[in-house]
Amino acid sequence: MKKIIKKMFTVLIIIALVIGIALGVYILTGLDNSLTLREYSFKTDKVTNPIKIAFVSDHHGSEFGENNSELMDMINASDPDVVLLGGDMFDEPEFVDIEKDLISQLTEKYDVYGVLGNHAYKMDEYTADDLRKIYAELGVTLLTEDCKVLMLNGEKINICGMDVYPENEGFDGRIDKTLADTDKDAYTVMLYHRPDKWEEFKGKGIDLMLSGHTHGGQWIVPGVFNGILAPNQGFFPKYAGGLYEFDDGMNLIVSRGLATKNTIVPRVYNPPELVVIKIESDR
């Protein structure tokens, strides 16, 4: 009897070790923070020639290669017609120079438009107005309740954006004001940092909404849940990252962002990503 118990105990130890090793390998594999390219494609009758957008969000002063060379190489290889910034590019003061350098590289080569995220209202040494000045000096057009009708690859497109406002401020009239000067026949892209507010934008004639903020829910268990925790959504967020389609024809892309620094919870099976969007004709 003692021999049987000893054998069973040994088997249980071996099983526990195998499970522990497998779990360790699984977690370590998931901690790979290599930069990822995430591509989306949409068909519309509002364009004839294709338009390509690079969407950069939640960078938080992170580094991908020296002077962010890996990120810049990926953007350049995608050959975008325009670069859009989804907010929370800047973070702690020690990362500001890193961010300035990246944005300078972008504006040297591309037209760059963006919005502020929630961290613009949380930084100790910089106010939102300070960041607006920095963006302007670097050549970024910030969209604050504003739309620009751009000509990209021979096609008109509305690029619109709104800041994230402090929690006690709402949306009353702001979205309609923002969209007032759009070309109603052109494809419309709306930049807004928080995806959980998508219902505010529904039914407004927006074709594509671009958001960030969630950092992909930090942890992903492939095939089980798409993120464990996101700000303003709590545990198991519905809009953690990816593409969401709504019945009014609006699509929402939530970037999982690029942040690898200053994160309390590590990213697991949730690599930082550059989003590239292609808008093509269905005619």
Residue ranges: model-predicted function:
Residues P195-V275:
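Conserved beta-sheet core of the metallophosphoesterase superfamily
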Residues V56-G61, G87-M89, N118-A120, D146-C147, ...:
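Active-site metal-binding loops of divalent metal-dependent hydrolases
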Residues N33-T44, T178-A186, L191, P195-D196, ...:
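Extended recognition/assembly regions associated with phosphoester-bond processing machinery
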Residues S41-A54, V140, C147-C160, D183-D185, ...:
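Beta-strand-turn-beta hairpins that frame and shape the catalytic cleft
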Residues D81-V82, Y113, V140-T141, I157, ...:
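Short, Asp-centered acidic motifs that coordinate Mg2+ and/or phosphate
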Residues T48-L143:
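Membrane-embedded segments
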Residues M1-V47:
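N-terminal membrane-anchoring alpha-helices
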Residues D129-V140, C147, L152-L191, W198-E199, ...:
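Binuclear metal-dependent hydrolase catalytic cores centered on His/Asp/Glu-rich metal-binding motifs
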